[in-house]
Amino acid sequence: RVSWLEAARDAGWWQKVAGTLLVPVLAIHVCVNRLVPMQDSMPIMQLSPSELDMSHVSVGFARHPMIMWGIYTSLCVAGAAHIMGGGAKIARRRGMQTRISYGVLAGVGLAGMLLLGTYTIAKNGATGVSSLMQERIMACYREVWPYSVLRS
């Protein structure tokens, strides 16, 4: 029987954990930003792709900052870890040497850049977004858990 600490030393274990953590947050992200906005119900009324810009995300940060930061931090960190682990696995299969320290450094850098971009979106809040558009955007959020259980 292998302890969790011994399993954690295996580089592939981290990639599997990151992939497992990525599934629910990626599903929430896709539902809120792609699937739900296509609905033809009021007040969403099929948000067009031109209306699904960064203001869609920034309104979410303005209304639910704790949840949004949790989801987007998980998305960035788990996504970067999963991508870097998968890249190393592919490189090993092709017979290339991999240096895990460089992979970890690159993953941290990638996650940091993604979070910096997320911070830039979040700091603007709902500035410049009309109240009607904010209501349409929040209707999208209210269709998806965890936002569906909150009052907004």
Residue ranges and their predicted role:
Residues R1-S152:
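Membrane-embedded alpha-helical bundles that constitute the cytochrome b-like, heme-associated redox core
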